[in-house]
Amino acid sequence: MKFDLLRTDGGARRGQLHLAHGVVQTPVFMPVGTYGTVKAMSPTEIADIGFEMLLSNTFHLWLRPGLEVIEAHGGLHRFMGWDKPILTDSGGFQVFSLGKLRKITEEGVKFASPTNGDKLFLTPETSMQIQRTLNSDIVMIFDECTPYPATERQAADSMRMSLRWAARSKAAHAGNPNALYGIVQGGMYEALRDESARELIGMDFDGYAIGGLSVGEPKDDMTRILAHTAPQLPADKPRYLMGVGTPSDLVAAVAAGIDQFDCVLPTRNARHGILFTRRGEIRIRNARWKLDTAPIDEECDCYACRHFTRAYVHHLIRAGEILGARLTTLHNLHYYHRLMAEVRAAIDAQRFSEFVARFHATQALGW
C-alpha cells in the first residue's frame, strides 16, 4: 500500500490510497457490505455511483457462508463480484456487540455463534488468517472495542489488551502483502488515547484507525476525543474513523484530519425511509409526502430523483415494496458519494472552510 498526501487545507487532507485492487481518492466514504453485499444494491450499481472501496465484515463472513466457500472462489473480490478495493474489519466490534454471549481472555474471545449456537474462539491470529483468506486490501488488527461507559481503569485495561493483541496481529500478518491498520482505543480518556497512539505508532502500521467512538457516547465526547487524537497520528499515513457517521459528522471529521470513513447509516436509514438531502433529512413515510410530486431532492441526479416522485417513494416504503428500499438506498449512497466528492473538490480548491459554512447553512434550511 502507498498513501500520497496531495494537499491540505487547514486540518483537512486530500490524498490517494494505492491498493492491490486500485487507487482510492481520499477523503473516502466506504459503504458497508456486511455479508459481502451492500444491502439492496448490486456491485455494478455501487460502482456506477462512483464508489471506489467497500467495507466487509470478517466476523459475519467467517460464520456465514464460511471460509471454505470464499476460498473456493479465490477470495472475497471474486465471491462478491467486486474488483475494487475492500477493507475488512477484524471482528472485534461484532464480538463486543454480543454482550453476555462472549467471554474475553488474554488469548482471545470465546463466544456462542449467533447463527447456530456453536462454541467459537476468535483470536488475533485467527482474525488475521481469516482476512488473509478473504484477501482484503486493508486488514484491521483484532482489538477489543472499549465499551461506553467505562471507568478509567476499565478503559486502560481494555486498551492495553488491544495493544498486546495489536502486536500479535502484526506478527500473524507477516507475509501478507496487503495493508494492516492499527486501531487507537482508550475510551473517553485523552491520556489513554495518547498511550494507545504512541505504542501503535511504534509498531509501524500501514495506517491508523480511531476506534471506540460512536458507541453511545455524547456527541461532545466524540468530538473532543477525535480532535485530540487525530493530529497525533502520522501525517504520512491514512487516518480512518470507524463507524462514523452522519453527513455533519463526516464534514467535521474531515476538518479534524480524517481520510477514511464507513457507516451503515445511509443504507440502514434508507430501509427505514429516512433520506439524506442537501437540506437535511426527509422521513418519507410521513403523511406530508403522500401527494408530493417533486423528486426527493431537486438538485440530486441519482436514478431515484430523476425518475420518481416523493409520493411514489412514500407509497413504496409504506407498502413494504422491495423497490422502495432499493430506491432509497441508491439515493442515500449517491448523496454520501457526492458529499465526499464535494469535500475533495473544496480541499483541492483551498476553499474547505467556505464549503463547511455553505454545507451547514443549507442543511439548516430543512424541508
Swiss-Prot record:
Pathway: tRNA modification; tRNA-queuosine biosynthesis. The active site is at 89 (proton acceptor), 262 (nucleophile). It is an enzyme of class 2 (transferase). Substrate binds at residues 89-93, 143, 185, 212. It catalyses: 7-aminomethyl-7-carbaguanine + guanosine(34) in tRNA = 7-aminomethyl-7-carbaguanosine(34) in tRNA + guanine. GO terms for biological process: queuosine biosynthetic process; tRNA wobble guanine modification; tRNA-guanine transglycosylation. Binds 1 zinc ion per subunit. Homodimer. Within each dimer, one monomer is responsible for RNA recognition and catalysis, while the other monomer binds to the replacement base PreQ1. This is Queuine tRNA-ribosyltransferase. It comes from Thiobacillus denitrificans (strain ATCC 25259 / T1). The lineage of its organism: Bacteria, Pseudomonadati, Pseudomonadota, Betaproteobacteria, Nitrosomonadales.
